[in-house]
Structure formats: structure tokens, C-alpha cells
Design a protein with these regions (language model features):
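Phosphodiester-processing cores and adjacent nucleic acid-binding clamps
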Residues: 1-168
Length: 168
């Protein structure tokens, strides 16, 4: 039975450059993407872009489009850090993403580089080099967007409990 091919790129991937998250090498990631027939694959390590040179080389050798990105940690007040995937669309986006990631390294908390809304606006907001040149997506259940959904779910649960108490 032939394995089905991936029609789109694999866009949320970590390698051993991601602290405490993956033991996979860049080569293994690219080999797996090729095996699945993916036309593109993204490298979105946590808080760093240190593997992008090997990644680009491996992708070129495999005939796969490399998408360079990062899974950034964004400060959310006292709630700790939220995750946000940022991927460069082109050279301008790559430069902005590199500068953003470098600046987050100066803002460590518990060993993790952290960005904030100010840095996001500086590098990706209107009038910046990265504006329109970087794609942002929710990362995981700890992501910026997922946290909004989960917060709304919590509010909905509270409303339903109140209704049950009123009806009971």
C-alpha cells in the first residue's frame, strides 16, 4: 500500500536545537518530510534559529522548500509565556525574524528567551521590515491564540454553571 503524500508543508517542527523538546536532527526532519512527500518543511525551534544553515542545505539536497521560522515565547503578564510560531516568507522576513530572535535572547526568564508585544510591533508591526514578510500562527495549546479559546471556554463553563445553579 502506497503511503499518502503530504499535499502541503509541515509547518511546526523542532530539532535538537529546541531545548528540552526534541532529539531529532535537522537531517532527520528533512528526510521524514521527503519520505512523506512534503513540498515544504518549516524549522520552528523554540526561541532559536541556530539550525537554519544546515536546514537550508538539507532541504536543497532533498529538493524541498525550506521555511525558516521560530516558535517564540511571548510574555503575557503574570500568566507566564505563550507560544507563537513566526515564519519568514522572504529575505526581509528572515532578517526581521533574526533580529527579533536575537533581541529575545537578551530577555531570558527561567532559561527561555522571551519576546513581548513591544518587540512584535517593532519587528513585525506596520512600517517595520517584517510587516507583511512574516507569517504568524498559533503554536499549540500554550499558544497565544489557543489561550484565548481556552479562556473563553472557561468563561462559557462558568456561565453554564451559573445557569445550572439558577435552574436548580
Amino acid at each position: 500500500m502506497e503511503r499518502s503524500r503530504v499535499k502541503y508543508g509541515l509547518l511546526h517542527n523542532h530539532t535538537m536545537e529546541s531545548r528540552r523538546d526534541s532529539a531529532m536532527s535537522v537531517q532527520t526532519l528533512v528526510d521524514r518530510a521527503k519520505e512523506l512527500g512534503a513540498p515544504a518543511v518549516a524549522l520552528t525551534d523554540h526561541g532559536v534559529m541556530t539550525g537554519y544553515i544546515d536546514f537550508a542545505r538539507c532541504c536543497e539536497e532533498a529538493g524541498i522548500k525550506p521555511v525558516v521560522g521560530v516558535e517564540a515565547y511571548i510574555e503575557e503578564g503574570s500568566e507566564g509565556r505563550k507560544h507563537l510560531i513566526l515564519m519568514s516568507k522572504n529575505d526581509k522576513g528572515f532578517r526581521a525574524l533574526s533580529k527579533f530572535t536575537t533581541d529575545t535572547q537578551h530577555r531570558l526568564a527561567n532559561g527561555f528567551a522571551r519576546g513581548n508585544k513591544e518587540l512584535l510591533m517593532r519587528y513585525f508591526g506596520p512600517g517595520s521590515e517584517g510587516h507583511g514578510n512574516v507569517i504568524a500562527t498559533s503554536a499549540c495549546v500554550q499558544g497565544v491564540l489557543a489561550s484565548i479559546v481556552l479562556a473563553n471556554r472557561s468563561v462559557d463553563d462558568d456561565i453554564n454553571k451559573l445557569r445550572e445553579q439558577q435552574d436548580g
